[in-house]
A protein has these predicted regions:
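A structural signal for multi-pass alpha-helical bundles of membrane permease subunits
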Residues: 44-339
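Transmembrane alpha-helical segments of polytopic membrane transport and secretion proteins
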Residues: 1-51, 139-144, 327-339
Length: 339
């Protein structure tokens, strides 16, 4: 400023400096420019809400709206008469559920089947973790992709087609029995499906075959997010591949595994019914009937929709309590809740 002080205006103009140049002039120039407005958080929130809205509507229609059907638990509901033509019986069906010795004995076996299937699933929940780690260690990318594809595809096969595969292989006239008979190893067909022995383990094996590859996808994504500098530092220190898996990969997958484990504990009564519905028969019905299938059989086969509704209510309430308990345990263990 002192160098230009007292200079003639034409000299300043020749030097490319306007007489009003300086901090004040610059601020005036900037003031005349267009300001960039910060993004509107309200507009962004509305956009995100519109994106989520269809899923909220679907959740409301298929998860919350059916709860209105719980009112049938207080009626002797007859589908042909409708709710208006059915007799109001109050808590009669609740009393039937807890007062009938036969009903309680049957329900006890159903709960034993349900809990056994769930605990077997929890006991084998680490298999997708180990499978993802081993799959990640395959160096040939074409072989890794082929294995991942072949193990993921069964997840997209319906349980009806899975049973068709099982029947064609393991029925009395299936491929396995035919081959063993032709080789002279057996004279009487072996019963793989028409038997009550090892039903829980058989259902577990089919469930693992169908869902192992799909369950490993989330862990493969978690492995891809691990900081590679950890592996590089360990290699510099002389760590082997097994040590990398044991001390880096496996511990880094544990937070994901714990969350999924807590959710599986909360859903311990939700086994689904499709698998058990297609595999059930007169020989294995006692040990294959889980709670979801039992509710279906009571309502549709036994023609007692009101009692089936009572069972569904108990299941929903217990599942909600288990979810809240699992969330509290997760919050205490991890410092943050899962819901």
């Amino acid at each position: 400023v002192s160098l230009t002080q007292g200079a003639r205006p034409e000299v300043l103009g020749f030097a490319g400096i306007s007489p009003g140049a300086g901090p004040a002039g610059a601020s005036k120039g900037r003031g005349r420019g267009r300001r960039r407005e910060p993004p509107s958080h309200g507009k962004s929130s509305r956009t995100m809400f519109l994106v989520v809205l269809p899923f909220l509507v679907l959740a409301f229609v298929f998860s919350y709206l059916p709860l209105l059907g719980w009112v049938t638990a207080f009626y002797d509901y007859k589908p042909a008469l409708g709710l208006g033509g059915s007799e109001f019986v109050g808590l009669q069906w609740f009393e039937v559920l807890v007062s009938s010795e036969t009903q309680l004995k049957q329900l006890g076996q159903v709960m034993a089947n349900t809990l056994a299937m769930s605990f077997l699933g929890i006991a084998t929940s680490l298999l997708p973790v180990f499978f993802a780690i081993l799959l990640n260690e395959i160096r040939a990318s074409w072989f890794r992709n082929a294995v991942q594809t072949l193990t993921t595809l069964p997840n997209f096969i319906s349980w009806v087609l899975v049973y068709m595969i099982a029947f064609s292989l393991f029925s009395s006239s299936g491929l396995v029995n035919t081959t063993l008979h032709d080789w002279g190893l057996i004279t009487v067909p072996m019963k793989f499906l028409d038997t009550d022995q090892h039903v829980w383990l058989t259902m577990l094996a089919w469930s693992l075959w169908k869902g192992l590859g799909w369950g490993a996808i989330m862990y493969l994504a978690a492995i891809a997010g691990i900081d590679q500098s950890l592996y590089e530092s360990a290699r510099i220190d002389g760590a082997s591949r097994f040590q990398l898996m044991r001390y880096i990969t496996f511990p880094m997958l544990m937070p994901t595994y714990v969350v999924l484990l807590v959710l599986s504990v909360a859903n311990i009564l939700n086994n689904g019914m499709e698998q058990f519905f297609v595999f059930q028969n007169a020989f294995n019905r006692e040990h294959i009937q889980v709670l979801d299938l039992y509710v279906y059989n009571v309502g549709m086969t036994g023609n007692s929709l009101s009692l089936a509704t009572v069972l569904s209510m108990f299941k929903s309430v217990i599942s909600l309590v288990l979810l809240l308990a699992a969330n509290a345990i997760a919050k205490r263990a991890r410092g943050s809740s899962i819901i």
